[in-house]
């Protein structure tokens, strides 16, 4: 901390107090964001509202169904329903997050739990293979990748004219306990592969993690998988 040069006891004390308050405010005030219509993704709007406001950014959450309604207007989505019996007679209890029969499209939102246990990573791959076997395209949205206009174009091949999530806001922080440090090796490998697909999102998240304690971010471990 740089202390102001003393001119008198009173003026120096006042300057020191103002400087100290400024530093404390910088540490305690969440990242300032402009008013955003679109927030961090949650599987549903109900879960988004339960999660409330993100303490780091002051930004709300937005249910995936609201994003889908803008990306694919006038289409019907089936949420969290068993895949059921297929044309070949095989029956499945697995439940994709969102399924659109008209588009033959399945959209999965993968939260932190999908990166913490190797059996979950394996199960996701197995389920995706089943969906694809029956002619569905599967789009997976990792919790650390937000639906910016560029990401939507990459994932869905759709150009949305209105601004979506701001590309400048990171998705991971030690405070939220959703960093690479909380992932298993299989999850880290998967995370690295997915981040490479979105260089801009990778850059903004890596930059944010660099400013925090590596013990709590696990950035140095993730970087080994990114090589």
Protein language model features and the residues they cover:
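Nucleic-acid endo/exonuclease domains
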Residues: 2-227
């Amino acid at each position: 901390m740089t202390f102001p040069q003393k001119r008198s006891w009173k003026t120096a004390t006042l300057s020191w107090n103002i400087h100290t308050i400024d530093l404390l405010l910088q540490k305690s005030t969440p990242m300032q964001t402009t008013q955003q219509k679109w927030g961090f993704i949650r599987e549903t709007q109900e879960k988004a509202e339960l999660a409330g406001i993100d303490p780091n950014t002051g930004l709300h959450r937005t249910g995936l169904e609201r994003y889908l309604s803008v990306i694919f207007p006038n289409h019907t989505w089936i949420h969290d329903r068993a895949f059921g019996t297929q044309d070949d007679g095989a029956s499945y209890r697995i439940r994709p997050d969102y399924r659109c029969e008209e588009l033959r499209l399945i959209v999965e939102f993968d939260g932190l739990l999908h990166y913490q246990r190797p059996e979950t990573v394996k199960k996701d791959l197995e389920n995706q293979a089943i969906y694809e076997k029956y002619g569905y395209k599967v789009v997976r949205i990792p919790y650390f990748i937000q639906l910016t206009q560029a990401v939507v174009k990459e994932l869905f091949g759709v150009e949305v004219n209105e601004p979506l999530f701001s590309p400048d806001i990171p998705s991971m922080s030690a405070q939220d306990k959703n960093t690479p440090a909380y992932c298993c090796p299989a999850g880290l490998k998967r995370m690295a592969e997915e981040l490479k697909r979105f260089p801009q999102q990778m850059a903004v998240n890596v930059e944010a993690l660099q400013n925090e304690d590596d013990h709590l971010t696990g950035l140095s471990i993730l970087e080994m998988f990114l090589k």
